[in-house]
Amino acid sequence: SGKYWQEGLFQKEIDLNMALIDEVWKKYGHHKSFQGWYLSQEISRRTKNMSKIYAEVGKHAKSVSGNLTTLVSPYIHGVKTDQVMAGDKALSVKEHEEEWDEILDNVKGAVDIMAFQDGQVDYHELYDYLVINKKLADKYNMKCWTNIESFDRDMPIRFLPIKWEKLLLKLDAARRAGMENAITF
């Protein structure tokens, strides 16, 4: 919803998403082009009950659609997040691993693909976070993709297109870390 889960109203978010899944599947599920689900809550830090949303909504989507693939695209709580720029502390690689290990343990069987957004950390840190993402995905039998942000967070004006050299750095870090696929926005 972009609203309820951010306000901590997790059951309302779950109910709304389940109704939407039912409606979308009824209307579009018969199309050959319908190949999976995107669970749209883009989170970073462990939030109380957030993994419950991923788990319940993901399992429901899979149950109504004959086990179609589910994808999440969270973000790394790094130095370029709005929260950190407003005074919150960025997660270290170790903290990121600990928090996401717990989240992914809670969503086993509900999420098939994890595609972390890559724009909230410094370029020199990206590879280390991607390695952890891949390690965790492997642990929980998920596919690990990268979601490459094709805009530049380092500019005072948000969001200008990224320079090719920076995009290439991100692609190379993803390749070296073993990402299985790349998407972008």
Please give the residue ranges for each predicted region.
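Glycan-processing catalytic domains of CAZymes
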Residues: S1-F185
